[in-house]
From Swiss-Prot:
This is Quinone oxidoreductase-like protein 1. Belongs to the zinc-containing alcohol dehydrogenase family. Quinone oxidoreductase subfamily. CDD domains: enoyl_red. It comes from the Eukaryota. GO terms for molecular function: identical protein binding; NADP binding; NADPH:quinone reductase activity. It is an enzyme of class 1 (oxidoreductase). The lineage of its organism: Eukaryota, Metazoa, Chordata, Craniata, Vertebrata. Its main location: other.
Length: 349
């Protein structure tokens, strides 16, 4: 049985993906479930986080968002039985790669998959669903009538976040990084209040948002990375179409919430003072926290269930690429790690 793993060279950040033979799994332990994987979604690997967690291994397993059929359960498993269809996210310290035919996983990382939902949809939207819930429900308390700016709304994550915001009755503004993205966002139903095309670099995001909200500013901003410095000091790659942190602070309304994905965000005293005057809050979106601490395991499982329910009722309509077979996973994973794809890539078994 083959599984996909990655190796990190000691000198630099470069990682290489390798298929490795894996011995057959032993008898299932107490609280563990043995799964036959039907689909596994590909996501970027946060090597920095793994290093900070002091997880030193020669080979790290690849692929964490999985959907599959229960083959066997341990003696203390209470939620599942053989032949159940399940979906979940493997923890960071999982021994088994999701990109493998059979895996072992603790029952507290899984929920039942509704019949209506396909394997690829389940695996392809579980992680983005968790991220959207974390950002909009737990970090910014989304409620009907609020205005939400979702940066890069045509990305796989942006799409789910927009659909969740619309479902909760919020007014959504979004940015598009290309003409294709703009057309995609304009086709959304219910319609997005305003699509800001930032591809030519001439449109000012803050001005557009203030205009749309009658000068009041938006209640919630969900960014997709920000520029920390002026154009001359920022590396060229980083420059591409990202808003400056001052723009985001400017367009935030009184009592607004800024949810950022920029882990190295630095705010100067004048920035902090401006946020203080607005009574605004800043939150960091790290969806791994649910799996790094078991304190809120119940909440986490409720989120997973809710994401599946919204998939089955058509609230979530994920942007998925054509499913690929396992033997193409290595090449696809290299592209995903370089952040080259727009739609979510899913391996189907």
């Amino acid at each position: 049985m083959k599984g996909l793993y990655f190796q990190q060279s000691s000198t630099d950040e470069e990682i290489t993906f390798v298929f490795q033979e894996k011995e057959d799994l032993p008898v299932t332990e107490d609280n563990f479930v043995k799964l036959q994987v039907k689909a596994c979604a590909l996501s970027q690997i946060n090597t920095k986080l793994l290093a900070e967690m002091k997880m030193k291994k020669d080979l790290f397993p690849v692929g964490r968002e999985i959907a599959g059929i229960v083959l066997d359960v341990g003696s203390k498993v209470s939620f599942f039985q053989p032949d159940d269809e399940v979906v979940g996210i493997l923890p960071l310290d999982s021994e088994d790669p999701g990109l493998c035919e059979v895996v072992r996983v603790h029952e507290h990382y899984l929920v039942h998959k509704p019949e209506k939902v396909t394997w690829t949809e389940a695996a392809g939207s579980i992680r983005d669903g968790v991220r959207a819930y974390t950002a909009l429900h737990y970090l910014s308390h989304l409620s009907p009538g609020k205005s939400v700016l979702i940066m890069d709304g045509a990305s796989a994550f942006g799409t789910i976040a927009i659909q969740l915001a619309h479902h909760r009755g919020a007014k959504v503004i979004s940015t598009a990084c290309s003409l294709e993205d703009k057309q995609c966002l304009e086709r959304f139903r219910p319609p997005i209040a305003r699509v800001i095309d930032v591809s030519n670099g001439k449109v000012h995001v803050a001005e557009s948002c203030l205009e749309e909200t009658g000068g009041l500013g938006v209640d919630i901003v969900l960014d997709a990375g920000v520029r920390l410095y002026s154009k001359d000091d920022e590396p060229a790659v980083k420059l591409q179409l990202l808003p400056h942190k001052h723009d985001i602070i400017t367009l935030l309304g009184v009592g607004g919430h800024w949810v950022t994905t920029e882990e190295n965000l630095q705010l100067d005293p004048p920035d902090s003072h401006c946020l203080f005057l607005k009574g605004a809050t800043l939150a960091f979106l790290n969806d791994e926290v649910w799996n790094l601490s078991n304190v809120q395991q119940g909440k986490y499982l409720c989120i997973l269930k809710d994401v599946m329910e919204k998939l089955s009722t058509g609230v979530f309509r994920p942007q998925l690429d054509e499913p690929i077979p396992l033997y193409e996973a290595k090449v696809s994973m290299e592209a995903v790690q370089k952040n080259q794809g727009r739609k979510k890539q899913v391996v189907q078994f």
